[in-house]
Amino acid sequence: MISAQKALERMVSPSAKVSAHWCIDEDGTIYKIVPENLRAWHAGISWWRGRRDLNDVSIGIEIVNPGHEFGYRPFTPPQMNSLVNLCQEILKRNPIHPLNVVAHSDIAPDRKKDPGELFDWSRLARKGIGIWPNSIKTSPWHRPLKLNDHNSEVKLWQSKLAELGYGLVQDGIYGENTELVVMAFQRHYRQARIDGVIDHGTSNILDHLIEYAKAL
């Protein structure tokens, strides 16, 4: 949303059919919009770890930023401070698995890009919120996989993305859906390179996260 005022106006309007439980302005102000025990309209058509329509089982936080369409910019320090504090309080009230701390783009990669590649997921992970790749071991080299590839290697990496939680068909065809899922993964975990290609760097991070998640 371009501003907190526009975000709040939209999220309290019944006709908009869009809402979240919380909203954080660029100055760090936190607004409570919907009680956490009630369903908000923030996830939309979505999928994560075998579940559809995540509005029923998730807590949504809107962080004010113009976004990619209107001048995307880094999130402010007051916003991030407030977000860390809010998330830590939410986690005290709700037993949320670290893998289930996700971006809108993770659960709806064909529709959404937020919060995007300027969002500091590593900071949240250092505070016990979600996961982040650290101490990455190098996986065996493979040639980059990209749009229109069709082979068993594609199917292998599709299955790994699905194991982490993403929703995609595991058919060995590197179609548009797979490319969008890879870009969503990169926006979250490899923000310096968002090209939809599974190269050595992206595959290393994915392998690391899968192994890390198994230990949680």
Kindly label every feature range from the protein language model.
Residues 96-111:
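Acidic/histidine-rich, metal-coordinating catalytic segments
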Residues 144-216:
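Short acidic, glycine/serine/threonine-rich helix-capping segments at coil-helix boundaries
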Residues 11-14, 36, 86-94, 126-130, ...:
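Structured segments of extracytoplasmic/periplasmic soluble domains
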Residues 48, 114-117:
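A charge-rich, low-complexity, intrinsically flexible signal that marks solvent-exposed coils, linkers
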Residues 70, 112-114, 183, 207:
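Short, function-defining helix-loop hinge/capping sites that tune catalysis or transport
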Residues 23, 117-140:
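Acidic, His- and aromatic-enriched active-site or binding-groove loops in soluble protein domains
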